[in-house]
């Protein structure tokens, strides 16, 4: 098996693990995971951000969540790669309520690390692509609202006829990104921030600050940075980007 192509190694492992998982979760972990293995879950199984270390913890998690999660339709996505004795592959699967994705790393034919995450809730798909808003009403209507009029009306109604269901404390990049996600799911959300303008949490820091992570790790949902964006973003440039993002999203 170890001399096979990475795609075959990953596909065979995933198919075998899925079969074994349906029969006996603990035996599946013992047979398909290294003793020194890790599984990090972002909501898909545990509805939490949780890291399981070692076979016992992984098996305990699966035994506790497998019935409610009901995972199915596991598939390798893209082309797996190999680096020495490690094979890396992206995969997708579904649970009872969500479409999910993950990445696994196999070492000597067994799982060394696995990451799983919810990508989309089945009952609450985001309004994008073919389901995006039309943005216009093609008929004569003297009471038609423009985009700006509708926005002002919704802002005036917020907190009166429509109450927030989620409160986000802090309007930095994390709070802003979460707010954008919740808006796409039509969840009324209030973000409270001590600074006057979006992005001020970056602008008000020391003069020479740039983001320590390169641009590829810093994208916000829906609007990635343009290709000419600097590798390390200056703080004031990041502040202006966040302010633009809030206005657009």
Regions found by a protein language model. Give the residues of each.
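N-terminal Rossmann-like FAD-binding beta1-loop-alpha1 element of flavoenzymes
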Residues: 156-191
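A solvent-exposed, acidic/Ser-Thr-rich amphipathic alpha-helical stretch
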Residues: 2, 19, 23-83
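Feature captures the FAD/FMN-dependent oxidoreductase FAD-binding
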Residues: 78-92, 96-109, 232-249
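Flavin (primarily FAD) cofactor-binding/catalytic cores of flavoenzymes
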Residues: 117, 164, 187-194, 236-249
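Short beta-strand edge/turn micro-motifs at domain boundaries
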Residues: 92, 99-154
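Short, low-complexity N-terminal intrinsically disordered segments enriched in polar/charged residues
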Residues: 1-35, 152-164
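Glycine-rich active-site loop/strand segments that organize a redox cofactor
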Residues: 203-240
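N-terminal FAD cofactor-binding segment of flavoenzymes
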Residues: 181-188, 194-216
């Amino acid at each position: 098996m170890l001399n096979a192509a990475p795609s075959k190694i990953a596909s065979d492992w995933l198919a075998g693990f899925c079969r074994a998982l349906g029969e006996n979760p603990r035996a599946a972990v013992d047979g398909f995971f290294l003793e020194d293995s890790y599984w990090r879950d972002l909501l898909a199984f545990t509805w939490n951000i949780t890291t399981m270390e070692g076979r016992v913890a992984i098996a305990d998690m699966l035994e506790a969540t497998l019935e409610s999660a009901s995972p199915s339709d596991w598939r390798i996505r893209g082309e797996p790669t190999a680096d020495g004795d490690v094979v890396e592959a992206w995969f997708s699967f579904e649970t009872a309520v969500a479409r999910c994705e993950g990445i696994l790393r196999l070492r000597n034919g067994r799982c060394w690390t696995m990451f799983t995450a919810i990508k989309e809730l089945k009952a609450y798909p985001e309004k994008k692509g073919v389901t995006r808003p039309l943005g216009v009403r093609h008929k004569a209507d003297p009471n038609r609202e423009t985009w700006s009029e509708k926005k002002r009306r919704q802002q005036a109604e917020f907190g009166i006829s429509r109450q927030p269901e989620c409160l986000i404390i802090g309007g930095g990049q994390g709070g802003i990104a979460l707010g954008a996600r919740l808006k796409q799911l039509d969840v009324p959300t209030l973000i409270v921030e001590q600074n006057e303008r979006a992005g001020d949490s970056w602008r008000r820091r020391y003069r020479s600050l740039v983001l320590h992570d390169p641009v590829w790790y810093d994208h916000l949902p829906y609007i990635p940075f343009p290709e000419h964006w600097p590798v390390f973003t200056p703080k004031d440039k990041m502040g202006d980007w966040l302010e633009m993002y809030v206005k657009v999203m």
